[in-house]
């Protein structure tokens, strides 16, 4: 029987005989003595095998990396000068008496401690990849976070209730994963994008406080922080307002960070969506970077410089400045790189002014401002730029001028990049956790392609009191009772107070141009049950994968999921998705359309 994990054998076991079991991490032959580093989930222990135990020595001599061994031996102190303070077992070693090979191993596709691996190699050989200490650490952290959430919510009176995995297809903004029904030919279940409607119905049923750590599914284009199947920490409450829900979930975040990482989160300031977009160009601002936008749209409407003038006079245009303290020393090469970078977000260029002497705001060769655009601006405008940005000698000011969406995304991304690259040295970046709440989101946003209003969060979010009538007269001015928890530029949780009256829910559907017939067809079960005394209710969902990615400092969300999909929604380990045979399709009353034969295609 195993005495303890390899990584936990320490000086407590000195002079005792112990048995450990694990994988050969490394094997070394030094002058007739064999050393094996045996690994399990808790770490390594150094095993020494000398020729005085010939049977154990012969077995050790035949062992190779990743063989599975059971080793019994006596614990002794390592010789002076060979200890390793970074390991729990670093002061001791195990002098082997008996070694049993529990299983041999083929040569692994890579060394466990190899850190220079492509993601394709790692995901194809995911089982071996999961043996790496970094992956073990990430998944242990994920477990600790999940357990911390459960402990906290249990203590707060929440009940863990499962909701269906097979449900009906309802529009929630992304494509559904559909599951054909064998019993009902031609009809389909959908895998849930969230438990949203079921958790609201649980509130109508009187459960008061619900939570669930649950899988959700969205068939959408994938990015670094997205997966087709992902895990939510989902909760819903009755009879609480926004402040109550934010207080509860803020407490949960504090406890999880304390228990899992020994981190004390600071204050959670609240910022309106309007302020977040005005100052940071993002509804999930990274407050570690202190740089802010300065609004210049109003002063650029009549300037001779066409780039600024045209943008300032667009109905949805915007002109902003971003002051970078000490940025005048940026090289031409760096500025060119930033110009290319903002182009990714649709910006057509990146104007800038280097501030050499703020006392000389002229437009001629005597100017203390260095830039090709200075001559196209007036002294009054230059003064406004310096005053609004608070620019000082040695600074650089970057400008964004375009549709507001382009400006927000391009200059917002530039703000983050410059902050991370130069902020610590320049005093405008702090390396710590900076949480906040973003509140007062718009209820709707206009989709120009479809010529209609769409829900910013989802169509079950309640408007602020007094805003119900705006849904029919001015949807763009309607504010939602929605809130997002943001941490270091990542939205880690989002929620809202829900609509608990059927008549208000019908008004929202109407504003979204969902006909009464479609409302009843797709959401009749919700509307009908809201009429049976639904309590005021609201909730929030955290993305567990995203939260753990942030806490672990991982490069990708795939580094905190045991068996993730690629950005093409494939599992390289199992080669899923895969074709199925004709018999299975026939049972489901399905027939695949053949791909068009384009050999020698049309001219």
Curated annotation (Swiss-Prot):
One of its GO terms (cellular component) is cytoplasm. CDD domains: AspRS_core (cd00777), EcAspRS_like_N (cd04317). GO terms for molecular function: aspartate-tRNA ligase activity; aspartate-tRNA(Asn) ligase activity; ATP binding; nucleic acid binding. Its EC number is 6.1.1.23. The record marks 30, 81 as: Important for tRNA non-discrimination. Keywords: Aminoacyl-tRNA synthetase, ATP-binding, Cytoplasm, Ligase, Nucleotide-binding, Protein biosynthesis. InterPro entries: Aa-tRNA-synt_II, aa-tRNA-synth_II, aa-tRNA-synth_II/BPL/LPL, Asp-tRNA-ligase_1, Asp-tRNA-ligase_1_N, Asp/Asn-tRNA-synth_IIb, AspRS_core, GAD-like_sf. GO terms for biological process: aspartyl-tRNA aminoacylation. It comes from the Bacteria. SUPFAM superfamilies: Class II aaRS and biotin synthetases, GAD domain-like, Nucleic acid-binding proteins. PROSITE patterns: AA_TRNA_LIGASE_II. Residues 196-199 are annotated as: Aspartate. Its main location: cytoplasm. It holds the Pfam family tRNA-synt_2. L-aspartate binds at residues 172, 218, 457, 498. Aspartyl-tRNA synthetase with relaxed tRNA specificity since it is able to aspartylate not only its cognate tRNA(Asp) but also tRNA(Asn). Reaction proceeds in two steps: L-aspartate is first activated by ATP to form Asp-AMP and then transferred to the acceptor end of tRNA(Asp/Asn). Homodimer. HAMAP family: Asp_tRNA_synth_type1 (MF_00044). Belongs to the class-II aminoacyl-tRNA synthetase family. Type 1 subfamily. This is Aspartate--tRNA(Asp/Asn) ligase. It comes from Laribacter hongkongensis (strain HLHK9). The gene is aspS.
């Amino acid at each position: 029987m195993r005495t303890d994990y390899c990584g936990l054998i320490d000086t407590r076991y000195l002079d005792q005989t112990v048995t450990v079991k694990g994988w050969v991490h490394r094997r070394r032959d030094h002058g007739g003595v064999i050393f094996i580093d045996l690994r399990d989930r808790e770490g390594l222990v150094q095993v020494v095998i000398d020729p005085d135990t010939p049977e154990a020595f012969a077995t050790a001599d035949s062992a190779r990396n990743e063989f599975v061994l059971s080793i019994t031996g006596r614990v002794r102190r390592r010789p002076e000068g060979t200890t390793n303070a970074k390991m729990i077992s670093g002061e001791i070693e195990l002098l082997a008496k008996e070694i049993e090979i529990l299983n041999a191993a083929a040569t692994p596709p890579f060394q466990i401690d190899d850190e220079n691996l492509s993601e394709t190699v790692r995901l194809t050989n995911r089982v071996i990849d999961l043996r790496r200490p970094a992956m073990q650490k990430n998944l242990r952290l994920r477990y600790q976070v999940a357990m911390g959430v459960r402990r906290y919510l249990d203590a707060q009176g929440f009940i863990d209730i499962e909701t269906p995995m097979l449900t009906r297809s309802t529009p929630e903004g992304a494509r559904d994963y559909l599951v054909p029904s064998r019993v009902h030919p031609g009809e389909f279940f959908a895998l849930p994008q969230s438990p949203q409607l079921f958790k609201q119905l649980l509130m109508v049923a009187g459960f008061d406080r619900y939570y669930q750590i649950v899988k959700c599914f969205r068939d959408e284009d994938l990015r670094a922080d997205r997966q087709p199947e992902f895990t939510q920490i989902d909760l819903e409450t009755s009879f609480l307002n926004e402040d109550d829900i934010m207080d509860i979930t803020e407490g949960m975040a504090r406890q999880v960070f304390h228990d899992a990482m020994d981190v004390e989160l600071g204050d959670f300031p609240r910022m309106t969506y309007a302020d977040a977009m005005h100052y940071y160009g993002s509804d999930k601002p990274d407050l570690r970077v202190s740089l802010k936008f300065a609004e210049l749209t109003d002063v650029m409407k009549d300037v001779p410089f066409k780039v600024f003038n045209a943008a300032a006079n667009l109905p949805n245009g915007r002109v902003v400045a971003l002051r970078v303290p000490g940025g005048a020393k940026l090289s031409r090469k760096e500025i060119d790189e930033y110009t290319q970078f903002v182009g990714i977000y649709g910006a057509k260029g990146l104007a800038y002014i280097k501030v050499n002497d703020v006392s000389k705001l002229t437009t001629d060769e005597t100017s203390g401002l260095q830039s090709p655009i200075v001559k196209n601006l007036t002294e009054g405008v230059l003064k406004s730029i310096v005053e609004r940005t608070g620019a000082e000698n040695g600074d650089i000011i970057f400008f964004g001028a375009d549709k507001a969406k382009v400006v927000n995304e391009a200059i917002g991304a530039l703000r983050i990049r410059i902050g991370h690259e130069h902020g610590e040295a320049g005093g405008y970046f702090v390396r710590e956790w900076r949480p906040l709440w973003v509140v007062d989101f718009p209820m709707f946003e206009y989709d120009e392609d479809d010529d209609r209003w769409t829900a910013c969060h989802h169509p079950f979010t309640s408007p602020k009191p007094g805003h119900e009538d705006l849904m029919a007269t001015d949807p763009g001015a309607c504010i939602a009772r929605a809130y997002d928890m943001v941490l270091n530029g990542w939205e880690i949780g989002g929620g809202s107070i829900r609509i608990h009256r059927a008549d208000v829910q019908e008004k929202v559907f109407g504003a979204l141009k969902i006909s009464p017939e479609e409302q009843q067809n797709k959401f009749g079960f919700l509307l009908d049950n809201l009429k049976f005394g639904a309590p005021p209710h609201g909730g929030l969902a955290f993305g567990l994968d995203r939260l753990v990615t942030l806490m672990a400092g991982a490069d990708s969300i795939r580094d905190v999921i045991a068996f993730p999909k690629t950005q093409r929604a494939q599992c390289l380990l199992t080669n899923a998705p895969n074709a199925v045979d004709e018999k299975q399709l026939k049972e489901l009353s399905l027939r695949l359309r053949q791909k068009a034969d384009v050999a020698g295609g049309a001219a």
